[in-house]
Amino acid sequence: MAVNPHAIFHYAGSPATTVLLAPSALFSEGQFTALWLVLSALSAVAIVRWLKLPIWWLLFPPTVEALYSGNPQLVVLMLLLAGAGRSGVAADTIAVTLKVYAIVPLLAERRPRRIVYALGLTLATVVVAPWLWTEYLTQFGAISARLERESAGGFSAFYHPVLLVPTAIAIILLWRRDRKAAGWLAVPALWPSSEFHYSTFAQPVMTPILAVLLSVYAQQGLVPVAIMLDVFWRFAAEPVRTRLAAWAAAASPETSGS
């Protein structure tokens, strides 16, 4: 449980996350906090470099929010972008153990080997700490309800019935056209009790529409609306450009005078 003078927030990680972070108990709270903030900052820099984004993307509001809150989000995204080979498989496995929704991009891009390893490590934590899982599953309903309350419904469409179905349809349509984009955008669009920093998952498939709208801190459905607009434009852009080019060609002086 985290407490500040203005609010109380409870730990919402799974037992897998708890087991993975257990070695942090070797450090004092201050030491681990400092180390984690440094790791998060290095992750933010790595993300920008690997995606070949301008350095000012470090000021992307969801990234800034993830940094000052010390959330594992940036570490998870960095691990998912770590690349191919054995190191990439290990990184993906750790990412999913830290945040279960990290499996969504792997599922969308059909990476069975990485999914199996990730699920294997998670299942191994059941053997290591079965009592944690028993307690977690027993209290899962209460934990989920508390998380919904403390996140004020989150930023995704999950708790907005009017937006949920059209957003899900948009992600499915996008998946048929671009699996990578659908996998990265599904989490900020649909994951329950999502936070502002979840929008950092859009960075690998960023567009101008997403860059502008996802920078705005708003919990009234802006994130799913932004993603639906982006999906619409991904489908409409080529036909619109083709039509505009045809109109421009028809209106050009050479065409008119021939």
Language-model segments: which ranges?
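Primarily membrane-embedded glycan-assembly and transfer machineries that use lipid-linked glycans
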Residues: 1-89, 111-258
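Transmembrane-embedded, aromatic-rich helix segments that form part
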Residues: 92-95, 101-110
